[in-house]
């Protein structure tokens, strides 16, 4: 059966409206899910371990005697790594090493160090940078097991110097994924609990008798997990609420069309709501890509998902030139942006909004997903306009440092008291003035 992908032309009269329709996505809020999550959070907050145990045994069809029994010892993670097929173990270890190396360099460059300076009067100003004490990592379980996500979330936290990393992963029917457990070991995870869903998010946010409360929760999950993360935000930090995966390919027509087709598939196979778009000034090349899609789709194990994604939210867009493609790309602000062209850096300089930019025809998005090194946790749904990939900077917090000298107390006090009186806050003004007087008396003495 032929696949029907939307085809647009930027020169068309209604192009702007057509593109908006392609991009339109609003996460549906299921009232039943919201009510269930609210109840689970409240229950875990009130009953702690007992509630977590009840929900875990019910939803994952287990018969655990306690939450403590759901914690995996480090020896089990070590056994999972040892038991991997050698080639797969080597790939996982290589990916972990590359992700760690990238984030160690990122730590050096991203302002992760405290700093201060001294003014002429002896006043010291600066900033103290501190890693978070404890971070929670949510990992989907069952069939949707992604060891790469474990590495991408755990390694930057460990590189940042987070004191403790606590991972939760559901194990429906007791099924454990050795790749996920091995990735937890390589990523430096300290504790692993086999719990999931909203109850796991609640346990991490509020703490229970067994599960320690964390300062921030990271990691993907289903609609229940996303709702729970939204609700606990403020009690703890969260990484983001990610939407469906996205890829935007800018191509000048010089890349093998089958490569481009497979790159579009690489996001479409995630789920039916994923979005894959091609922008290209060469109409004949677009037709070749369309033909390659039709030829390659039947070879894909997840062809039904890919078809639904491409037909529902995909597009092949003819643009006037590559400069226009860059302008459109900035408006879309995609999660993944491939610039598959002879001169990728020329066009890359024009890109301002994208979660990750893949330069050159040999740079497939899938390499970034697994092993290039940069983080694959990226902003979606146009949030790349104001958000960044997950990184070591997400696991630091900053405190301002102020140490005022006696002379500085006089200089700053005059400014502060004047402004405080202007705002009608007399105690603020007096607090500054007392120190002005005290500093003056000390200098006289």
UniProtKB/Swiss-Prot annotation:
<feature type="binding site">
    <location>
        <position position="270"/>
    </location>
    <ligand>
        <name>substrate</name>
    </ligand>
</feature>
<feature type="binding site">
    <location>
        <position position="267"/>
    </location>
    <ligand>
        <name>Zn(2+)</name>
    </ligand>
</feature>
<dbReference type="GO" id="GO:0008270">
    <property type="term" value="F:zinc ion binding"/>
</dbReference>
<feature type="binding site">
    <location>
        <position position="267"/>
    </location>
    <ligand>
        <name>substrate</name>
    </ligand>
</feature>
<dbReference type="InterPro" id="IPR001692">
    <property type="entry name" value="Histidinol_DH_CS"/>
</dbReference>
<dbReference type="GO" id="GO:0005829">
    <property type="term" value="C:cytosol"/>
</dbReference>
<dbReference type="GO" id="GO:0000105">
    <property type="term" value="P:L-histidine biosynthetic process"/>
</dbReference>
<keyword id="KW-0368">Histidine biosynthesis</keyword>
<feature type="binding site">
    <location>
        <position position="245"/>
    </location>
    <ligand>
        <name>substrate</name>
    </ligand>
</feature>
<dbReference type="InterPro" id="IPR016161">
    <property type="entry name" value="Ald_DH/histidinol_DH"/>
</dbReference>
<keyword id="KW-0520">NAD</keyword>
<dbReference type="InterPro" id="IPR012131">
    <property type="entry name" value="Hstdl_DH"/>
</dbReference>
<dbReference type="GO" id="GO:0051287">
    <property type="term" value="F:NAD binding"/>
</dbReference>
<feature type="active site" description="Proton acceptor">
    <location>
        <position position="335"/>
    </location>
</feature>
<keyword id="KW-0479">Metal-binding</keyword>
<feature type="binding site">
    <location>
        <position position="423"/>
    </location>
    <ligand>
        <name>substrate</name>
    </ligand>
</feature>
<dbReference type="Pfam" id="PF00815">
    <property type="entry name" value="Histidinol_dh"/>
</dbReference>
<feature type="binding site">
    <location>
        <position position="428"/>
    </location>
    <ligand>
        <name>Zn(2+)</name>
    </ligand>
</feature>
<dbReference type="InterPro" id="IPR022695">
    <property type="entry name" value="Histidinol_DH_monofunct"/>
</dbReference>
<dbReference type="GO" id="GO:0004399">
    <property type="term" value="F:histidinol dehydrogenase activity"/>
</dbReference>
<feature type="binding site">
    <location>
        <position position="270"/>
    </location>
    <ligand>
        <name>Zn(2+)</name>
    </ligand>
</feature>
<comment type="similarity">
    <text>Belongs to the histidinol dehydrogenase family.</text>
</comment>
<feature type="binding site">
    <location>
        <position position="369"/>
    </location>
    <ligand>
        <name>substrate</name>
    </ligand>
</feature>
<feature type="binding site">
    <location>
        <position position="336"/>
    </location>
    <ligand>
        <name>substrate</name>
    </ligand>
</feature>
<feature type="binding site">
    <location>
        <position position="369"/>
    </location>
    <ligand>
        <name>Zn(2+)</name>
    </ligand>
</feature>
<keyword id="KW-0862">Zinc</keyword>
<comment type="function">
    <text>Catalyzes the sequential NAD-dependent oxidations of L-histidinol to L-histidinaldehyde and then to L-histidine.</text>
</comment>
<feature type="binding site">
    <location>
        <position position="222"/>
    </location>
    <ligand>
        <name>NAD(+)</name>
    </ligand>
</feature>
<protein>
    <recommendedName>
        <fullName>Histidinol dehydrogenase</fullName>
        <ecNumber>1.1.1.23</ecNumber>
    </recommendedName>
</protein>
<feature type="active site" description="Proton acceptor">
    <location>
        <position position="336"/>
    </location>
</feature>
<feature type="binding site">
    <location>
        <position position="138"/>
    </location>
    <ligand>
        <name>NAD(+)</name>
    </ligand>
</feature>
<keyword id="KW-0560">Oxidoreductase</keyword>
<keyword id="KW-0028">Amino-acid biosynthesis</keyword>
<feature type="binding site">
    <location>
        <position position="428"/>
    </location>
    <ligand>
        <name>substrate</name>
    </ligand>
</feature>
<comment type="pathway">
    <text>Amino-acid biosynthesis; L-histidine biosynthesis; L-histidine from 5-phospho-alpha-D-ribose 1-diphosphate: step 9/9.</text>
</comment>
<feature type="binding site">
    <location>
        <position position="199"/>
    </location>
    <ligand>
        <name>NAD(+)</name>
    </ligand>
</feature>
């Amino acid at each position: 059966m032929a696949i029907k992908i939307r085809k647009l032309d930027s020169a068309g009269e209604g192009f702007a409206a057509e593109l908006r329709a392609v991009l339109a996505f609003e996460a549906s809020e299921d009232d039943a899910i919201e009510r269930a999550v609210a109840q689970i959070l409240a229950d875990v907050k009130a009953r702690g371990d007992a509630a977590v145990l009840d929900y875990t045994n019910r939803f994952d069809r287990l018969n655990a005697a306690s939450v403590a029994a759901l914690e995996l010892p480090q020896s089990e993670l070590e056994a999972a790594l040892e038991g991997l097929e050698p080639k797969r173990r080597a790939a996982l270890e290589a990916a972990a090493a590359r992700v760690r190396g990238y984030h160690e360099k990122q730590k050096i460059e991203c302002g992760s160090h405290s700093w201060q300076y001294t003014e002429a009067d002896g006043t010291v100003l600066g900033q103290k940078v501190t890693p978070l004490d404890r971070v929670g990592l949510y990992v989907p379980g069952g069939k949707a097991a992604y060891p790469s996500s474990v590495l991408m979330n755990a390694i930057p936290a460990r590189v940042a110097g987070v004191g403790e990393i606590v991972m939760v992963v559901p194990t429906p029917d007791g099924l454990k994924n050795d790749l996920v457990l091995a990735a937890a070991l390589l990523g430096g995870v300290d504790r692993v609990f086999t719990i999931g869903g909203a109850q796991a998010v609640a346990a991490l946010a509020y703490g229970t008798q067994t599960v320690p409360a964390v300062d921030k929760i990271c990691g993907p999950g289903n609609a229940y997990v996303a709702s729970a993360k939204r609700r606990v935000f403020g009690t703890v930090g969260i990484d983001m609420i990610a939407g469906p995966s996205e890829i935007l390919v800018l191509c000048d027509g010089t890349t093998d069309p089958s490569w481009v087709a497979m790159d579009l598939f690489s996001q479409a196979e995630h789920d039916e709501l994923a979005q894959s778009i091609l922008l290209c000034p060469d109409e004949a090349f677009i037709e070749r890509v369309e033909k390659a899609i039709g030829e390659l789709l039947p070879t894909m194990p997840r062809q039904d998902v890919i078809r639904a994604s491409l037909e529902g939210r995909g597009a092949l867009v003819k643009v006037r030139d590559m400069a226009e493609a860059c302008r459109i790309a900035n408006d879309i602000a995609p999660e993944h942006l491939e610039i598959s062209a002879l001169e990728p850096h020329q066009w890359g300089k024009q890109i301002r909004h994208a979660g990750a930019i893949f330069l050159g025809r040999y740079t497939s998005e899938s390499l970034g997903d697994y092993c290039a090194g940069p983080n694959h946790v990226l902003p979606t749904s146009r949030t790349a306009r104001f958000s960044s990939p997950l990184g070591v900077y997400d696991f630091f917090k900053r405190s301002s440092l102020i140490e005022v000298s006696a002379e500085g107390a006089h200089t700053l006090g005059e400014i502060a008291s004047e402004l405080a009186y202007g705002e009608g806050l007399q105690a603020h003004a007096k607090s500054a003035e007392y120190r002005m007087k005290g500093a003056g008396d000390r200098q006289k003495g």
